[in-house]
Amino acid sequence: MSCTIEKALADAKALVERLRDHDDAAESLIEQTTALSKRVEAMKQYQEEIQELNEVARHRPRSTLVMGIQQENRQIRELQQENKELRTSLEEHQSALELIMSKYREQMFRLLMASKKDDPGIIMKLKEQHSKIDMVHRNSCEGFFLDASRHILEAPQHGLERRHLEANQNELQAHVDQITEMAAVMRKAIEIDEQQGCKEQERIFQLEQENKGLREILQITRESFLNLRKDDASESTSLSALVTNSDLSLRKS
């Protein structure tokens, strides 16, 4: 009796597992059927749109079609020209950013050399600032220009690709705006660093002038002291001569 119950339970368990497998297979079939139905629906819609376009094209005269094609070709040429201008603008922005970064590195090096004997905290702060800005510049420039070069396409041959190119150009223009904004930030940072460098140079010049004045005062004091010593020596010599002369006169008398 117990064997039959265990066998029945095992059979029931096997049936449950088979039912689960069948359910999984049914769900996958349902998903595939849904995807196929969506694809068929999209193909039907595409076919209907093509038929509508063909009907419209049949009713339109050829001159209108030729004019439309010419206008589209003109727009394509304009988009090609815009692509060239955007590419040139990207190259100019890249060269400008490289120049800005080289000037910034040179200014930072000067500040580090000028502040080397003043405060080690300033040196660490300047190094951290330089590394952060350099990393931001490298990552942003590489990402922006790689995306820009990837999205510059050749001229399209029909309306859908032309809209795709316009979207790419909008994205490219956004990248150019971001690069321009970053260049403005870099210019502002360089101006601040130049102001700090001018302050440091003014301080160094002031200290040099003070040092020069102190050296002149010291030289004048030293010369005065030497002159006083010479005067004292001459006075002592004259006094000794007078004493000698008076002694001789007394002896003669």
Swiss-Prot record:
Transmembrane segments: none annotated. Induction: By wound, in oral mucosa undergoing tooth extraction. Residues 235-253 have a biased composition (Polar residues). It is found in: Cytoplasm. Residues 5-104, 160-223 form a coiled coil. It comes from the Eukaryota. It holds the Pfam family SIKE. One of its GO terms (cellular component) is cytoplasm. The modification Phosphoserine is found at S140. Residues 231-253 are annotated as: Disordered. One of its GO terms (molecular function) is identical protein binding. InterPro entries: SIKE. Keywords: Coiled coil, Cytoplasm, Phosphoprotein. The keyword Ion transport does not apply. GO terms for biological process: response to wounding; wound healing. PANTHER family: FGFR1 ONCOGENE PARTNER 2 (PTHR12186:SF3), SIKE FAMILY MEMBER (PTHR12186). May be involved in wound healing pathway underlying the favorable early wound closure characteristics of oral mucosa. Accelerates the collagen gel contraction in vitro. This is FGFR1 oncogene partner 2 homolog. It comes from Rattus norvegicus. The gene is Fgfr1op2.
